[in-house]
């Protein structure tokens, strides 16, 4: 990043923080804060200034406004002395339960596609927290990270004292880590929810798909699994309609059906080449597990700006997620024209418009210029004096 580009981004961030009112996190006096600044080394050598505490939300606001950070964070933990220079001296008082969803850990693709995919993961997670874990949704704070994902903060007091091992159990359940598909079927009872019913639905859809395909194709797919030959594959294929019925009436009886069913299901749920396994993984939530188990984590400050995108870190109510579009709702800047220089061609959407960026110099809206410069896709070439 050229110095002029860094200065341009910091100027835009300064304008934002001059006007923005950032709501402090709850119990602000018990939170540690950390910041990354636009110093001469940024972004090649990033260093965080942490072990910072504030006595009030106004003090936090004034600090951010005067120093204009590139990135702002606060602790998910509560401390008696958050500004103490060592973790041992802070005196840990508990921590919010956090789930981090980051598209970069799930897929590669366009920024727009990644944002759409991770929104689906957020909706899936919220459904699990509400309908399977019984968490009071009024205690959940949902935040768009400003980058490629969402942070789900569970501030229910019952979880605040959980140690890493207890948090691990929760995130393992959410992510489906260590589940036993055969046990899920064996233990199934009418009305049972959670992974038992999720796996039943996954298996039902998988068998329904097999039932629509040519028998030759089904035999080839099943017989490719270890321990499943052509004869067994053909016999299993003939049983699919009956198995679908059982999955909808008495799933626990399926594994008692006969050895063919046990062998094929065993291979489908364990063999690396199984075409069922991706569907099981898709039924899980793709959360970043280490974030949940870390009881001293720093996480992005809602209302701040993310200097790798120029987007706002947006807090929202759970009910607002469905209509939230980060490519519109998280954009902090407007239409004033700036000049950028790009060494490559790019295509993307922002603020409801599609942009095709050619190589070379180009006038673009400020929102587009900040986005491209923050992501390292362009350098600033100038700001038009006549723009308003």
Swiss-Prot record:
Leading EC class: transferase
GO biological process: DNA replication, synthesis of primer
EC number: 2.7.7.-
MF-aspect GO terms: DNA-directed RNA polymerase activity; metal ion binding
GO cellular component: DNA-directed RNA polymerase complex; primosome complex
Family to which the UniProt record says this protein belongs: Belongs to the eukaryotic-type primase small subunit family.
Cited PANTHER family: DNA PRIMASE SMALL SUBUNIT (PTHR10536)
Quaternary structure and partners: Heterodimer of a small subunit (PriS) and a large subunit (PriL).
The protein's role, per its UniProt record: Catalytic subunit of DNA primase, an RNA polymerase that catalyzes the synthesis of short RNA molecules used as primers for DNA polymerase during DNA replication. The small subunit contains the primase catalytic core and has DNA synthesis activity on its own. Binding to the large subunit stabilizes and modulates the activity, increasing the rate of DNA synthesis while decreasing the length of the DNA fragments, and conferring RNA synthesis capability. The DNA polymerase activity may enable DNA primase to also catalyze primer extension after primer synthesis. May also play a role in DNA repair.
This protein's name: DNA primase small subunit PriS
């Amino acid at each position: 990043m050229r110095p002029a580009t860094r200065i341009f981004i910091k100027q835009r961030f300064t304008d934002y923080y001059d006007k923005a009112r950032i709501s402090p996190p709850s119990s602000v006096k018990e939170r540690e804060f950390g910041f990354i600044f636009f110093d001469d080394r940024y972004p090649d050598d990033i260093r965080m200034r942490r072990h910072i505490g504030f006595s009030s939300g106004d003090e936090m606001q004034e600090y951010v406004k005067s120093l204009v950070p590139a990135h702002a964070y606060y602790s998910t933990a509560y401390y008696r002395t958050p500004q103490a220079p060592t973790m041992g001296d802070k005196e840990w008082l508990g921590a919010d339960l956090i789930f981090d969803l980051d598209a970069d850990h799930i897929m590669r693709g366009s920024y727009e596609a990644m944002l759409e995919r991770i929104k689906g993961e957020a909706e899936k997670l919220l459904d699990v927290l509400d309908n399977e874990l019984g968490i009071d949704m009024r205690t959940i704070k949902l935040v768009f990270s400003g980058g490629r994902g969402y942070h789900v903060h569970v501030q229910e007091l019952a979880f605040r004292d959980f140690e890493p091992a207890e948090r691990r159990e929760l995130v393992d359940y959410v992510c489906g880590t260590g589940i036993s598909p055969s046990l899920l079927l064996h233990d199934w009872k009418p009305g049972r929810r959670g992974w038992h019913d999720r796996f039943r639905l996954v298996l039902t859809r998988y068998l329904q798909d097999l039932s629509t395909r040519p028998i030759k194709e089904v035999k080839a797919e099943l017989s490719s699994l270890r321990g499943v030959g052509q004869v067994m594959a053909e016999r299993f294929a003939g049983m699919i309609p009956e198995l679908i019925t059982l999955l909808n009436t008495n799933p626990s009886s399926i594994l008692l059906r006969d050895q063919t069913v046990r062998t094929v299901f065993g291979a489908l749920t364990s063999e690396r080449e199984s075409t069922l396994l991706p569907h099981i993984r898709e039924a899980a939530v793709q959360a970043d597990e280490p974030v949940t188990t870390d009881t001293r984590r720093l996480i992005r400050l809602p209302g701040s700006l993310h200097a790798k995108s120029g987007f706002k870190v947006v807090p929202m109510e759970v009910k607002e997620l469905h209509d939230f579009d980060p490519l519109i709702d998280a954009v902090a800047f407007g239409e004033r024209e700036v000049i950028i220089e790009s060494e490559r061609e790019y295509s993307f959407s922002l603020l409801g418009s599609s942009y095709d960026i050619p190589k070379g110099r180009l006038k673009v809206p400020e929102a587009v210029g900040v986005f491209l410069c923050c992501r390292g896709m362009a350098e600033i070439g100038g700001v038009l004096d006549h723009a308003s």
